[in-house]
């Protein structure tokens, strides 16, 4: 974990390529650089919810609906990410369902 970094300098100098993931505290802080770098293949993930919420980076793309021109890559990535997060949460729940009971230390 590194940072924080100012968004304009971070993306402007290509630092994002040195990391596996970039976390922004605000939606608009990283949306423009994210879309410019990953348009057509990126996935938005909203953390901290009880449900898994992902979406393709292009949003609804209603201007392409019914025209046979949309690229499904970003939608597929969003679905696969949602499935991966769901499975990871299931695995975590399974691993932590029966924790060891705390023992009192002998004095």
Go through the PLM ranges and name each one.
Residues 1-104:
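Glycine-rich phosphate/nucleotide-binding loop
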């Amino acid at each position: 974990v590194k940072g924080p970094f100012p968004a304009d300098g971070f993306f402007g100098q290509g630092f994002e390529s040195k990391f596996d993931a970039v976390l922004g505290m605000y939606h608009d802080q990283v949306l423009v650089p994210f879309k410019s770098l990953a348009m057509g293949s990126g996935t938005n993930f909203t953390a901290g919810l009880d449900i898994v919420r992902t979406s393709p980076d292009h949003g609804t793309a209603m201007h392409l609906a019914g025209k046979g021109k949309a690229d499904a890559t970003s939608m597929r990535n969003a679905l696969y990410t949602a499935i991966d997060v769901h499975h990871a949460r299931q695995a975590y729940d399974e691993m932590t369902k029966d924790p060891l009971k705390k023992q009192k230390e002998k004095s």
